Structure formats: structure tokens, C-alpha cells
């Protein structure tokens, strides 16, 4: 499929700190891409670079084949960017903020009115459009920013935390809208809410320290972990001697001790019984076995160097 966005060796620095480290990848037209990762992984900076609101220190970003670094104004007409925090003009109403951006892009007044009505209705925002941005709730401000960035009908929508500051109902209506737009538009978003990511993605990028360390569909990413199980055994008294004995079992992977509980991974359930055999005679309080999930992909040790 045709790419909406292509990155070639994109780098971003802050003093001597690397924020983005030579990123190269493409994003297919009409796809919904989720970006996840720990704090300070570079997620928000990547969105700003993709939107053209920040220029990379090196490398190139192409929007529908246009080099953003050389023809920034041309390429930005294809994108809408919703940052995490509100950047609305506090002296204007929510509707005035939206209309102003529409006029900047040369959208006809009739189309602005039509789109405001459509998207504000979808987001249950109509009754709040007359309020000054300075007194709007953070959730309604976020909705207004989404409407504002859709007002010029961009082919690419980039959002930092789509449902930040929203209640459950508002979050649900926001995702309903975004899922309807998927396919028609390329949607790229950052979210710390893994349940949201699990419900809305064609592809997931996992970032760590400015790099993409995992990239694929959720099914493909989880396939790499499904051969593993995570085990927990809580003892009445897990001594260092006992922990070291259990950790020494050759089939145990990445054992950790938290209080009186040992956490470890293994490729097969048989590992569990090997550990229980080594712990024979010790008093136990609780046992658990589970498959790895998307949340485990965010564990820096697992994602960064695997379980082996």
C-alpha cells in the first residue's frame, strides 16, 4: 500500500541527549497506528516531528512524498495535530478557535459550519461551543482541539493521548469517531491506556529511549511472547537462600524477588513444577500462572533485550 508518511534516519537532540535516534519507517495510508512506551521514550517528540511542529536535527520526513523539512507549509496542509495539553486561544470561544483555524486553511465558511456541526455533534460538544476556552473543561478543550484539526479535512490525524482529561462516556464517543475515520484518514496516536490501544490499532510501535524496539500488529507482537508464561509463587518466608536456589533452576528466566514472592518466566508450564520441586517443604501462600500480554511489552527489560 501507498505510504502516507515516510521517515528516513530521523534524529532529534536536546543538548547532548538523544530524543529520537535515527528512526526509519513508513506508515501506510489509511492505517491506525498506536505508539506506546515508557515515559521519556520520545513518543510526543515523534508526533511533533511527524506533524511538522518540530523540525528534526537530521533526517527527512516525507508526507505523501513531500519533504516536510523543505516544504513544511505544503506538507502541513495534509496533517492535523492535537497535542497533549490545550493550545486553544483562551480569549476565544471553542467555536471561534475552530473557525479561526478553518479560515487560516482557506476553508469556506459553509464547510466550516457543516464540519463543526458534524464533529461537535459526534463528540457531544455542541452545547459547549459558545464557552470561552479559558473556562472550558479540559475534556471539552480536547474535543474542541480534535474538531479544530479535522476542520480542514486533513488526510493524516496525529493525536497525543486522544482521550486525555475525558470521562468514560466522552472517551467512548471520541474513539467511536476515530474508528469511523480510520481507513478514510491515517491516524497516528500516543496513548498510555493499553485497553484503548488493544481496541484501536492496525499497528503498534513500541518506543524506548528514542528508538522503535518493537513494530507490528498486536497479534504479531504477542506471538513473540505467547511461548512464554509468567509465574508467581508467594511464600510465607522467601529467604535469599531459597530465592537463589529457585533462580538457579536452568529453565527459569528473569527471576525477581519482591517481598516473599518470586516472579519468573518460562517457556513451558513444566518450569513451574520444576521450581515447586525445588521448593518442596517450604510453606506457600499463593500461586499464579499467566500468559504474557501487551502490558508486558512495555516492560523495559522484556522489550529491550527479550526474555533470554
Give the role of each language-model region.
Residues 99, 103, 110-128:
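Conserved ABC ATPase "signature" region
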Residues 36-38:
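The feature captures the beta-strand-to-loop junction immediately N-terminal to the Walker
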Residues 59-70, 74-75:
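Conserved ABC transporter NBD signature motif
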